[in-house]
Amino acid sequence: MESTLTLATEQPVKKNTLKKYKIACIVLLALLVIMSLGLGLGLGLRKLEKQGSCRKKCFDASFRGLENCRCDVACKDRGDCCWDFEDTCVESTRIWMCNKFRCGETRLEASLCSCSDDCLQRKDCCADYKSVCQGETSWLEENCDTAQQSQCPEGFDLPPVILFSMDGFRAEYLYTWDTLMPNINKLKTCGIHSKYMRAMYPTKTFPNHYTIVTGLYPESHGIIDNNMYDVNLNKNFSLSSKEQNNPAWWHGQPMWLTAMYQGLKAATYFWPGSEVAINGSFPSIYMPYNGSVPFEERISTLLKWLDLPKAERPRFYTMYFEEPDSSGHAGGPVSARVIKALQVVDHAFGMLMEGLKQRNLHNCVNIILLADHGMDQTYCNKMEYMTDYFPRINFFYMYEGPAPRIRAHNIPHDFFSFNSEEIVRNLSCRKPDQHFKPYLTPDLPKRLHYAKNVRIDKVHLFVDQQWLAVRSKSNTNCGGGNHGYNNEFRSMEAIFLAHGPSFKEKTEVEPFENIEVYNLMCDLLRIQPAPNNGTHGSLNHLLKVPFYEPSHAEEVSKFSVCGFANPLPTESLDCFCPHLQNSTQLEQVNQMLNLTQEEITATVKVNLPFGRPRVLQKNVDHCLLYHREYVSGFGKAMRMPMWSSYTVPQLGDTSPLPPTVPDCLRADVRVPPSESQKCSFYLADKNITHGFLYPPASNRTSDSQYDALITSNLVPMYEEFRKMWDYFHSVLLIKHATERNGVNVVSGPIFDYNYDGHFDAPDEITKHLANTDVPIPTHYFVVLTSCKNKSHTPENCPGWLDVLPFIIPHRPTNVESCPEGKPEALWVEERFTAHIARVRDVELLTGLDFYQDKVQPVSEILQLKTYLPTFETTI
């Protein structure tokens, strides 16, 4: 038994041991072979290097190597070059980086950069010389620096600013392909970045690049597209013509001029406008555009500018790459070409950061890496042809593509007489599956700020995502990628990353618009910005120590209180309410307008939780009207409320509100008849009816609705517009209040007859009164404000607010939504969403200033005001 057990256990041990011995022997034998070969090869290579290598012998005519090989210029012709001549003497002159083979090389005058031992002294090292040849840690491998102070070498008193644009780098690339872009991804990780940066409309290259360096909307700086016509100049602008260098096209003050006007030098390595004598001046240093210049050469040149003596060295720099835009156009955003382009630009960006580190500037320079717009896929089966809508098209000219405009063909003769209204009518609601909406340019969403410029043609087509609108089927420029679309499309979102001593580290911020970058760069340079469309201070949260501290605007026109003198009106103003049978009943409901101080305090707390809007217009006589359910600011000259504010709570029950009393209007006894609207204004046979700024149906009791059925709450509305207005307040407003735990509502009329995005002066409005006493608003605004923390109501919100502003065009028809045969539920919400806006847009159009009593830093209030809600969820 014992013997059997011994045999049974010993046998496997012997087999395993033998197997291990065999493996060990094979491995040892292999190692001996490798060592022998390695030793032999090593000795041989050293012998070859000693006797037949061109290392440190390039173009030395006297050198004779192994078997009399040569390294001079003529060796290729003779056929006697040493074995490594091509790699050592030729290829080394074509690359921008060092490698171990190049380290310590003999200086080659034809080299793009040097890896010789004296290159640091002569300031011509390749960007990675120290990390490759001297063993220093590369920028990519180095940990994120968290120093609080600038780490600038001697001679750099203040951090330089580099503005780096990679054309067409859509924000989504940064997350989808991050592992393929280690350098850019490190900048994102170590510095500050936004989820995306919003481009201006149209999302094209020239308009957005010039917006970035001026802080102006395209309508303000004049570069409204890559292609355009100016009737006053009677000239056409395009990227392929020399006309683009005519200063007459370029308005505003670009960043390089702002810096130069305040004693700084500026250098631009390509940027739209940089080779134009804007205001008679060029940048201190600039390069005429040449798209064939390698990216590495551009980077190398910028690094050399940083090596200039202090007195000659710029403080502001721009850098521009055409990629990944070019590859996106050719192959579409999801293509191998784009992936390759991203790797190429990442490598070049890494070269910049290595070059900065080599100069000890990597934690001294403030660098901003951004894009002008995104990119989307287009398809040849997603084309809208104007020949499908017009029997002939030879009478108009069309700028085709994702952001089409239409004007007269015969220019300048027919430019102003061209019937734009008829074109829009003929293109409206023609097909159930139409993939564009036609607009007269003044009717475009106000958030676009794309109207007030003679170069913006009056007919505009707002095209669906991935679709193109063109003249006819002869246009075959489809497929691949394109941009120019609605700037709310996610595919049009651009990147924004920043790094440097002035920026916070390892931080992600909410999206913002590229009009804000100009002010930010001025703060980095510690200079005063020129007037612009940005909101100075709204990006303070990107900086460790903000240079500029904003404050609330000072009120220009003070308010009064419309006092209660008599419960019975001195004039009826042609108003009538059959439900109030006698003067006693009339007196009773009017007495409800006479609030005590305690009641005023209570209504202000609930209905003005963030303070009353301040009036920034000059000479505006207005008074406050207090009610239990709402507060309004009444404009006496306009005879209507400028704004009305109230809070809609989250409904705790679903019981219906009391029915509204029909056909009941009365004069507000607090407002003199000479400053009030007459109800008879709405009785004439016209397309205008009255609407209520504060909806009577929102009152919680049947009696309190009488506070809203008064002349001081009346605003003129087109019949069709009122349908949409009433649906919003009766359905959508309740929905928002339910979802957000209550909302504060501020709404009012807008007058922008000259469609410049700013409130009209009184004389401008007077021109459009059309022989009536009541001016008709061009738009109405609604601003919904709730607490970001939905466990709090608006009136008890301790932290950040959430906003949802709308600016709705006031037009006689709803043709924009093609509502024929559709219930309001199918189109009203979409219309409001299409006209989403920023609070700042509302302020500009009304001359009002919001949230001044909200206890929060002003810079954070400005973040709120410049925030644009979005509804797009897919790319």
From Swiss-Prot:
Induction: Up-regulated by stimulation by allergen or by cross-linking with IgE. The IgE-mediated activation is enhanced by tetradecanoyl phorbol acetate (TPA), a stimulator of the PKC pathway, and inhibited by the P13 kinase inhibitors, LY294002 and wortmannin. Up-regulated in invasive bile duct cancers. Changing E275A: No effect on substrate specificity. Increases affinity for nucleotides and slows their hydrolysis. Residues 31-875 are extracellular. It comes from the Eukaryota. InterPro entries: Alkaline_phosphatase_core_sf (IPR017850), DNA/RNA_non-sp_Endonuclease_sf (IPR044929), Endo_G_ENPP1-like_dom (IPR001604), ENPP1-3/EXOG-like_nuc-like (IPR020821), His-Me_finger_sf (IPR044925), Phosphodiest/P_Trfase (IPR002591), Somatomedin_B-like_dom_sf (IPR036024), Somatomedin_B_dom (IPR001212). The chain crosses the membrane at residues 12-30. Changing N227A: No effect on affinity for nucleotides and enzyme activity. Its main location: membrane. Its cofactor is Zn(2+). One of its GO terms (cellular component) is apical plasma membrane. Residues 50-93, 94-138 form the SMB domain. Changing K204A: Strongly decreases affinity for nucleotides and slows their hydrolysis. PROSITE patterns: SMB_1, SMB_2. Zn(2+) 1 binds at D167, T205, D372, H373. Optimum pH is between 8.5 and 9.0. Its EC number is 3.1.4.1, 3.6.1.-, 3.6.1.9. It catalyses: a ribonucleoside 5'-triphosphate + H2O = a ribonucleoside 5'-phosphate + diphosphate + H(+); ATP + H2O = AMP + diphosphate + H(+); CTP + H2O = CMP + diphosphate + H(+); GTP + H2O = GMP + diphosphate + H(+). It is an enzyme of class 3 (hydrolase). Belongs to the nucleotide pyrophosphatase/phosphodiesterase family. Monomer and homodimer. This is Ectonucleotide pyrophosphatase/phosphodiesterase family member 3. It comes from Homo sapiens (Human). The lineage of its organism: Eukaryota, Metazoa, Chordata, Craniata, Vertebrata. The gene is ENPP3.
